[in-house]
Amino acid sequence: MSDQLVAPPPENCPGTQSEMSGKSAACAGCPNQQICATAPKGPDPDIIEIEERMKTVKNKILVLSGKGGVGKSTFSSQLSFALSMDEKVEVGLLDIDICGPSIPKIMGLEGENIHISGQGWDPVYVQDNLAVMSVGFLLEKEEDAVIWRGPKKNGIIKQFLKDVYWNDLDYLVIDTPPGTSDEHLSIVQYLKTSNLSGAVIVTSPQDVALIDVRKEINFCKKVGVPIIGVVENMSGFVCPKCNKESQIFIPTTGGAEKMSQDMNVPFLGRIPIDPLIARSCDEGKSYLITHPNSEATKQYNLIFNKIKEIVNNSK
């Protein structure tokens, strides 16, 4: 099981094969604790299947946030839409926010179902080169609650990675829930040997959000996930009448750029508030296409180009 760990074992670790694995005092606070406590002893054959399935995916990008409500899923969707605007580029969007799957609605795929073929689970397509998978496609009704403990969440994430037939992808964007929970440990564990490109971390400017983003950055550093960069979302509001910018969420400690400098991680840019972004998400449309000349679209595209450059130059 040692090849499944997401971080080096701590001092006084009882060992991955011990009956006290994940349960001793030395395990408290270790990123591997849940893995050691719940995983069966011995190698996990599913990891080999995941590695084989992921060989056809060139770039795998995690989208993270420390706190909920900062626009992470919106960012994931618009990144996927932007990448797929090149018809020669194949894009997948995987939603592992198990308890709050919003991607089907944002992508205009409400009411769609998963179909199984001889090659595995078929993702749902927005267009020929943009495929989506989410637990939301497994629910009978949109408002159905997903009340699962960690092991069941881990199981569905593993199934998404090893059983979904993505075919050849240039990019797989992975939308995660906020925080550093079971879903994050699982995705890092399962993709550890599959050349994870890195993580984009989304925040809003105020300090209450930045506190949790610092934790997210430390999580990535601890488990060995490369940080592509930090995005400050909801950064100011430009009045459509007078073009004057107002700060809705005041960056009292310098905002995401200052925090990125302090923590020595790349800062990718700022996206202003635009109520039409929320409307596009509610309607399941690409904001970049419906509002190509807006200031937010300009900033989105600058950030997306930086992400592509960083990911492609990291190989």
UniProtKB/Swiss-Prot annotation:
It comes from the Eukaryota. GO terms for biological process: iron-sulfur cluster assembly. Its main location: cytoplasm. Residues 1-23 are annotated as: Disordered. Binds 4 [4Fe-4S] clusters per heterotetramer. Contains two stable clusters in the N-termini of nubp1 and two labile, bridging clusters between subunits of the nubp1-nubp2 heterotetramer. ATP binds at G66, K67, G68, G69, V70, G71, K72, S73. Its cofactor is [4Fe-4S] cluster. The keyword Plastid does not apply. It holds the Pfam family ParA. [4Fe-4S] cluster 2 binds at C239, C242. Gene3D superfamilies: P-loop containing nucleotide triphosphate hydrolases (3.40.50.300). It is found in: Cytoplasm. Coiled coil: none annotated. [4Fe-4S] cluster 1 binds at C13, C27, C30, C36. GO terms for molecular function: 4 iron, 4 sulfur cluster binding; ATP binding; ATP-dependent FeS chaperone activity; iron-sulfur cluster binding; metal ion binding. Keywords: 4Fe-4S, ATP-binding, Cytoplasm, Iron, Iron-sulfur, Metal-binding, Nucleotide-binding. One of its GO terms (cellular component) is cytosol. InterPro entries: Mrp-like_CS, Mrp/NBP35_ATP-bd, NUBP1/Nbp35, P-loop_NTPase, YlxH/NBP35. Heterotetramer of 2 nubp1 and 2 nubp2 chains. HAMAP family: Mrp_NBP35, NUBP1. Belongs to the Mrp/NBP35 ATP-binding proteins family. NUBP1/NBP35 subfamily. This is Cytosolic Fe-S cluster assembly factor NUBP1 homolog. It comes from Dictyostelium discoideum (Social amoeba). The gene is nubp1.
